[in-house]
Structure formats: C-alpha cells, structure tokens
Regions:
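Primarily NTPase-proximal linker/entry elements flanking Walker-type ATP/GTP-binding cores
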Residues: 1-56, 63-83, 91-99, 103-108
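Acidic active-site catalytic centers that drive phospho-/nucleotidyl reactions
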Residues: 33, 57, 109, 147, ...
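Conserved catalytic-core segment of NTP-binding enzymes
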Residues: 66, 87-101, 115-221
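Short glycine-rich anion-binding loops that position phosphate/pyrophosphate groups of nucleotides
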Residues: 111-113
Length: 222
C-alpha cells in the first residue's frame, strides 16, 4: 500500500520550474472542486507566491460566485467573465493576465459535466490548447478533485476523466468523516496517478499535502 513513489513529497512544494505555473483543475460538480482551489490558493499565498485564479467553470453561476468568495478569503485576484462565457476565453485571459502581472501560479477552475462527454472533451482540449498558446507547456499540472466519500463512484469518475485529459495529480476531499482511506490508495494505484492533496474539513487550512506513509499508518490504527 505504501509503495507508490510519486506521492512521497509530504511537504508543500511551491517551487516551479517555470513562471507562471499553470494548473488546470477538473472534477464533477459537488466534489469540492472550487473549495479545493480556494484552499490551494491560500497554501500558495502563504508560501509567498503570487497567485491568480481563473473562473472557467462558466456554466454554473454558483461556481463563479463561489470562486470569487474564495479569492477574497485567500486574498488573491480572480479572472472572470459573465455566466455562459466561453470557458476557453476565460482560461486564456487568466493565463495571459498571470503572465502580464508576473504571477507565480494560476489555478483555473473548469466545468465538470461528465454526462455530456463529447462537449466536455472538446472543451478541455480547447482550454488546454489556448493556455499552451500563451505559456509554453501549459497546463503544467492537471488536478482531478474527487469526493472520497463516494467510493466506487469516485473511481468511475476518475476513469472517465482520464479518458480525455492527462491527470497529473489527485485531490481527495471529504476525508474528515469515517475511514474512506482505501479508496484513496485504490484510485491512485489503479490510475497510476499520485494523490497530491487531501481535504479534511471545511476551513481554509483544511487541505493537506498527502503523505502516503502517514495516511496508511493512520488507516490501520484502532
């Protein structure tokens, strides 16, 4: 269980090989995606980085509003457009702005409508393409947010997303309740994608860097 070298880095790594470092965040609605982005922004800001958020989940007015609230809580700027704006346009603006304002990192929230795979696939591809036009190699990370409490369902969602976007890391939320740890390790091993962060509560500080050894040990404690 403990042997998956990629998710060893238990300390928070805020050093990027390039600037701005672009992170695209994916996941279905209701898994805590926007909340996780807010908490990540807070972590990076605390580490002394210039952070920018991009609200490219434009089909859900609540998502943009929610991200705006988190941007205020974390005290970082946000790039947004009106509801139903083209997500790729928002992503483009975010990356362009991050570059112009010398930001260290941009976190871009994207829509998670898995029921319409074709359009979502096209949208993701377009978002990646426009980001890459502004900053070479962007997005440098693609994080998939999953609700650990949904068990097998989380596994299916993870597989569905990996079909059309290269996931580089997992964020597992709602781990503050009963032991749902097995699914965390299961998804990571099955997809061969490291778990980067775990969400253990509602507060801004409640996103932790994943430490596999510590995590597995705590699973087997009485």
């Amino acid at each position: 269980l403990k042997d998956h070298s990629d998710d060893k880095p238990a300390e928070f790594d805020a050093d990027f090989p390039q600037k701005p470092h672009i992170v695209m965040v994916v996941g279905v609605n209701g898994v805590g995606k926007t909340t996780s982005i807010g908490k990540l922004a807070h972590l990076y800001k605390k580490a002394g980085k210039n952070v920018m958020l991009g609200a490219a989940d434009t089909f859900r007015a609540a998502a943009v509003d929610q991200l705006k609230i988190w941007s205020e809580r974390a005290d970082v700027p946000i790039i947004q457009q009106g509801q139903n704006a083209d997500p790729a346009a928002v992503a483009y603006d975010t990356v362009e702005s991050a570059k112009a304002k010398d930001a260290d990192i941009a976190l871009v929230d994207t829509a998670g409508r898995l029921h319409n795979k074709k359009s979502l696939m096209n949208e993701m591809a377009k978002i990646k393409r426009v980001m890459g036009k502004v900053v070479e190699g962007a997005p440098h990370e693609v994080l998939l947010v999953l609700d650990a409490s949904t068990g097998q369902n989380a596994m299916q969602q993870a597989k569905a997303f990996t079909d059309f976007v290269d996931i580089t890391g997992l964020v597992l939320t709602k781990l503050d309740g009963t032991a749902k740890g097995g699914i965390v390790i299961g998804i990571s091993n099955e997809l061969d994608v490291p778990v980067k962060y775990i969400g253990v509560g509602e507060e801004i500080e409640d996103l932790q860097v994943f430490d596999r050894e510590l995590f597995v040990n705590s699973m087997f404690k009485d």
